Each structure stands twice: as C-alpha cells, then as structure tokens.
Design a protein with these regions (language model features):
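RNase H-like two-metal-ion nuclease catalytic core shared by retroviral integrases
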Residues: 187, 209-231
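C-terminal accessory extensions appended to soluble enzyme cores
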Residues: 167, 236-299
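Two-metal-ion acidic nuclease core segments, chiefly of the RNase H-like superfamily
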Residues: 192-209
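Charge-mixed, compositionally biased segments that are often intrinsically disordered regulatory tracts
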Residues: 37-113
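Electropositive, glycine- and tryptophan-enriched low-complexity nucleic-acid-binding patches
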Residues: 112-178, 183
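Short, conserved catalytic/metal-binding motifs centered on acidic residues
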Residues: 1, 27, 39, 90, ...
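A short, amphipathic alpha-helix used for macromolecular contacts
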Residues: 1-34
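Extended hydrophobic secondary-structure segments that form protein cores and membrane-embedded regions
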Residues: 21-22, 88, 174-181, 209-214, ...
Length: 299
C-alpha cells in the first residue's frame, strides 16, 4: 500500500502533513482482490484519515497584538471593579428568513423539508442580529435589523440595550465597549464614532472603546458567550419568520445562567453615509498612549 500511494501522495515533503489524491475505489482498482473498505483500513494503519480544511490562519499577528490585549484586560478589570457597565458587542452574520436549511440538528420525529437552494429571492428578508453582552451580569440583548449593518445600526443597538439595562447601573457615568477591529463598528469607520458621540451626549456617559487587534475577532466575548449559545439553541431549526428567529434568541440560556432579550428593528438604515472632516473635528474624543488607533474615549 505504501508503494501504491507513493506517486499519489501530496503535501509538504519536509513536513508531517501529507494527503492522498486518489479515492478509495480508485486505489482498490489498482490492487487485485482488495475492496475499498480494506484500502480504508490500510490507510488508517498508515496514519491517514478523512480531514476537512480548518480555518485557523489569520495572517501574521500585529506587533501590538499582545500589548492591546493586556490593555483591554486592564480596562475591563478597572470598570468591573468599579461597578461600571462593560459590554462586548458585535453583529452576527446575517440570516435569510424563510424556508431555508439551518445548520445543525435537533431531536424530532422527522426532519423538516426546506428549500434545496438558498436564493435571496425566495427569502422574506435578510436579518442581521447585533448582540450586546454585559460582561458583569451574564445578560445579553439582541437587536434584529432588516436593513443595512451600518454604524448607525450598531450604535442604536447599544442605545436600546442601555435604555433597557441602565436601571441596573443607576450611578454609572461611563461605559466600556469591547468590539472587534472591522465591520460597521470597526476602528476605521467615521460613522461609528459620530453615532457614539450622539449616544454619549444623550446618555451623559463617557464611552470608552477598545478594539480587538487584527485577526482576533473570534476572541471577542460576545462571540462565545452570546452568539455561541444562540447558534446552539436554533441549530437545525429553519428560521421561517422573524418571530421564529426572535423566539429562538429569547429562549437561549446556558449553564452559566445566561438571559437574553431580543427585539425587532425595522428602521431603514442608510448605507454609504459620509462623515466629513469638519464633523470629525467636532467629536470630543481622546486617545491614550497605548495603541491610540484601537482605543479612545468619547464624552
């Protein structure tokens, strides 16, 4: 078998990862009186097995990656120790609402029949869930929008969360927001910062923002502590309507006692809004010496 697969083996000649280009039946056809099941057993004995691609590589790490993570940890400890609100927020990947397959499985007497193809034209709409996770309270709120995932939508989702949860922080004068480095709430978009200024003015809060460094968005707390349980709860359940989606989100919990609220946001958010230089100069924004492009406070 080793000689048979030698010419069909690819991979790094100096590394440990190798693969066989031929199928089991093709290999079996090259040997008399050997079935493909026998070929499978022999390949396993040689250390081969079926494997899928793994999305793990995120490019070279930014030189300030560790420095930024240490800064975020210090800020989070500072806010939590003082009893001030600290949240992790982001937008979940958008979902087609309709009779479409939803990855995962669930216990039932028979599987649901869904559309064979995920055509946008067959969907009622495309829904984007923006989640806000309270790092101290183990509580989450999800704002489900049906238009663009913009800076306005992101900040409004945080605004809605604050209106619901501010009673839990009656003496708060500041808010920490942990977000990733890209998307509508990334460190580059001007609209995100302008809307945060409006939120700060409305709420009389000093808003401190810390962005995750490049390639580290999967470490954001909202991904694991809110979106992960939500995905598990609706796994295998077609999101045939917005109400089904909202109920699945609201019914999410875990062993840590997670509680989640959700609401529908039908506002039409305009895309491609330009924020001018004069508008940016009006923002009351300060930056620390540590990674100033990723950290700032708006008051």
């Amino acid at each position: 078998m080793t000689e048979l697969i030698a010419e069909a083996t690819g991979g790094d000649p100096e590394g440990r990862r190798k693969y066989v280009r031929l199928s089991l039946r093709t290999l079996a056809g090259k040997v008399k009186s050997v079935s493909h099941t026998t070929v499978r057993r022999l390949l396993k004995q040689l250390g081969y097995s079926l494997r899928a691609n793994v999305k793990r590589l995120s490019g070279p790490p930014h030189p300030d990656r560790d420095r930024q993570f240490r800064y975020i940890q210090r800020k989070q400890r500072e806010f939590l120790k003082a009893g001030d609100p600290a949240i992790s927020s982001d937008a979940k990947s958008s979902e087609l609402i309709g009779n479409f397959k939803n990855d995962g499985s669930l216990w039932c007497d028979r599987g649901d029949e869904v559309n064979a193809y995920d055509f946008r034209s067959d969907a009622q709409c495309r829904a984007t869930a923006y989640g806000v996770y309270d790092l101290a309270k183990c509580r989450g709120h999800v704002n489900v929008g049906t238009s663009g995932n913009t800076g306005e939508f992101s900040v409004h989702s945080i605004r809605v969360w604050w209106k619901k949860e501010s009673r839990r922080y009656p003496h708060a004068r500041r808010l920490l927001i942990k977000v990733d480095g890209g998307g509508s709430n990334g460190w580059r978009p001007r609209l995100w910062k302008r809307e945060l200024q409006r939120l700060a003015d409305e709420s009389d809060l000093r808003i401190t923002v810390c962005h995750d460094p490049r390639g580290a968005s999967k470490w954001n707390d909202v991904e694991h502590r809110l979106f992960g349980p939500i995905s598990i709860n609706w796994a295998g359940q077609p999101l045939r309507s917005l109400e089904v989606m909202l109920n699945a989100i609201r019914g999410t919990t875990n062993a840590s006692g997670l509680k989640v609220t959700a609401q529908l946001d039908r506002h039409r958010y305009t895309t491609k809004i330009k924020v001018s230089d004069p508008e940016m100069k009006e923002l009351n924004i300060t930056r620390p010496k540590t990674c100033p492009h990723w950290n700032y406070t708006i008051a």
